[in-house]
């Protein structure tokens, strides 16, 4: 049987996506698809396919005429190896569990396919910020779960294992694990403070502590928290996810002195730069730490098309078509995957079809066959222009509004034998940050190149000659400037 070359496959599917005529009756089987492209998943080292299967769309909000299990099985058959779900995605984990039984992925059962299990990367999420029950209600600290919202992170973790590998009632077989747990949907700085309790502060087993030190126990098989008395190793990696607040996500990464965070799931699409964007803010920080980076919200949760620009409420909000003639889906996927630092993109599937030219999964698969530098800057700008007026540019309801280039944060001054000026990163607007200028008594005395600030160690400039006043200015690659307040020496 002839296997379609990548070029043949892309040309054929591109024609269909553009609404052009394809020979009547032409079909190609899944065994004719070119092998999926992969990228090294940051410091995790796993060779991840550029397309991952998202656990929402019809896996969460299942239309009456859709069975989610064949969607998962088809993704496996096509060679997709990254799978995403969450404890907030309704029955999504249960659907994965049904598919895993058909694929012999249940440890301890006859025919368990350990090789297949090792070939995939399975991620779930917890929106619990605390490790165990009995936590205070704090402003801007949300603890949500479709299971027990008051149960803490361990309850969520074991719920995931039970739903995907066990009986769905809290039990799971020995040998069960998830490749990664992400802290779900980081929105506020206050949540970061809670999640680092027990790391930045001593562990007090009589009190509560954050999700990170808790998950670390179940990654390493330790029992520092007292929550893992069997010394189970149930997860292999820990990460974070977020769509709203790049500064909070930067803070989460910077505070990780223990190298706990291996990956980040982040919203990225062609309208990103209309908002407080991620591609020039948190993504470079995660990339500088060699984290695995997963793209989501490639189609703005469907708002690039016919869906309302708000959180999906039910199956009526699930998109079940492949792009439109006016706005093909392929360039939007290519945009996300050519954003510097991105390794894979998870995309939810509304439906699959026997006609591969109309199948969301197949069409997303071919669109994801793009190299990291596969689009020119000009082409990326053209894609941005094609979407900037969709819903008047208000597609990314899940993202903080545009605020422009900011001054450096937390500027301070110390005097001893010399003057030392310290500051934290500015936040970029449309263009990446370039450098910082230091002014003494209104005159330029130094420049400091911007680098992603990967820790809480600040930028520093030392001045041997003492002046009366100092100011630090952030400058982006277009020459835009933002001045911090003047400090008196």
Question: What are these language model-derived features?
Answer:
Residues 2-121, 130:
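N-terminal binding-site loop/beta-alpha segment at the start of enzyme catalytic domains
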Residues 257-260, 281-417, 422-434:
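Structured C-terminal cap/extension of enzyme domains
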Residues 435-465:
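Recognizes extended acidic, P/S/T-rich segments that occur
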Residues 142-270, 287-294:
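Glycine/proline-rich, positively charged
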Residues 477-489:
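Extracellular fibronectin type III
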Residues 54-65, 126, 136-152, 316-324:
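Active-site mouth loops of central-metabolism enzymes
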């Amino acid at each position: 049987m002839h296997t379609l070359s990548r070029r043949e496959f892309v040309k054929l599917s591109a024609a269909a996506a553009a609404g052009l005529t394809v020979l009547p009756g032409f079909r190609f089987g899944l065994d004719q698809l070119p092998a999926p492209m992969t990228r090294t998943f940051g410091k995790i080292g796993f060779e991840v396919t550029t397309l991952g299967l998202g656990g929402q769309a019809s896996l969460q909000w299942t239309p009456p005429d859709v069975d989610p299990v064949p969607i998962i099985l088809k993704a496996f058959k096509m060679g997709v190896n990254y799978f995403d779900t969450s404890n907030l995605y309704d029955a999504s984990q249960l659907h994965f569990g049904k598919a895993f039984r058909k694929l012999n992925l249940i440890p301890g059962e006859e025919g368990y396919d350990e090789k297949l299990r090792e070939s995939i990367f399975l991620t779930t999420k917890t929106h619990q910020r605390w490790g165990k029950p009995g936590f205070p209600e704090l402003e801007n600290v949300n603890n949500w779960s479709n299971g027990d919202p008051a149960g803490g992170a361990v309850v969520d973790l074991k719920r995931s294992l039970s739903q995907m590998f066990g009986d769905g009632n809290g039990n799971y077989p020995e040998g069960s694990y998830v490749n990664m747990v992400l802290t779900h949907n980081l929105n506020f700085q206050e949540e970061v403070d809670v999640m680092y309790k027990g790391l930045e502060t001593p562990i007090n087993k009589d009190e509560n502590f954050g999700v990170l030190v808790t998950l670390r126990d179940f990654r390493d098989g330790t029992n520092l928290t007292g929550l893992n008395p069997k010394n189970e190793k149930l997860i292999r990696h820990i990460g974070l996810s977020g769509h709203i607040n790049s500064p909070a996500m930067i803070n989460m990464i910077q505070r990780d002195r223990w190298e706990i965070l291996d990956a980040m799931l982040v919203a990225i699409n062609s309208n990103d730069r209309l908002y407080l964007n991620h591609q020039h803010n948190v993504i470079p920080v995660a990339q500088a730490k060699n984290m695995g980076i997963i793209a989501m919200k490639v189609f703005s949760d469907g708002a690039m098309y016919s869906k309302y620009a708000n959180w999906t409420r039910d199956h009526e909000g699930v998109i079940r078509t492949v792009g439109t003639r006016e706005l093909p889906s392929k360039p939007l996927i290519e945009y996300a995957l050519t954003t510097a630092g991105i390794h894979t993109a998870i995309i939810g599937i509304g439906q699959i079809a026997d006609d591969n030219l109309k199948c969301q999964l197949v069409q997303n698969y071919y669109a994801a066959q793009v190299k990291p530098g596969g689009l020119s800057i000009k082409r990326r700008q053209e894609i941005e222009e094609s979407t900037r007026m969709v819903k008047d540019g208000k597609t990314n309801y899940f993202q903080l509004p545009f605020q422009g280039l900011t001054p450096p944060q937390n500027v301070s001054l110390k005097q001893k034998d010399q003057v030392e000026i310290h500051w934290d990163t500015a936040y970029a607007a449309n263009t990446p940050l370039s450098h910082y200028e230091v002014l003494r008594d209104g005159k330029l005395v130094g420049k400091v190149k911007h680098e992603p600030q990967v820790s809480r160690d600040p930028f520093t400039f030392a001045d041997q000659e003492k002046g009366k006043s100092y100011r630090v200015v952030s400058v982006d690659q277009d020459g835009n400037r933002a001045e911090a307040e003047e400090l008196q020496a």
